[in-house]
From Swiss-Prot:
The keyword Phosphoprotein does not apply. GO terms for biological process: defense response to bacterium; defense response to fungus; killing of cells of another organism. Plant non-specific lipid-transfer proteins transfer phospholipids as well as galactolipids across membranes. May play a role in wax or cutin deposition in the cell walls of expanding epidermal cells and certain secretory tissues. Has antibacterial and antifungal activity. Inhibits the growth of P.infestans. The keyword Disulfide bond applies. This is Non-specific lipid-transfer protein 2. It comes from Nigella sativa (Black cumin). Keywords: Antibiotic, Antimicrobial, Disulfide bond, Fungicide, Lipid-binding, Plant defense, Transport. The lineage of its organism: Eukaryota, Viridiplantae, Streptophyta, Embryophyta, Tracheophyta.
Length: 25
């Protein structure tokens, strides 16, 4: 699951990246 997978929704992509930034694995 990556930003490229949710390219259909830029908002989802942003939230995905934000979530990763807030919770670094």
């Amino acid at each position: 699951d990556s930003c490229q997978d949710v390219k259909q929704s830029l908002a989802d992509c942003l939230m995905y990246v934000t979530g990763r930034a807030l919770k670094p694995a």
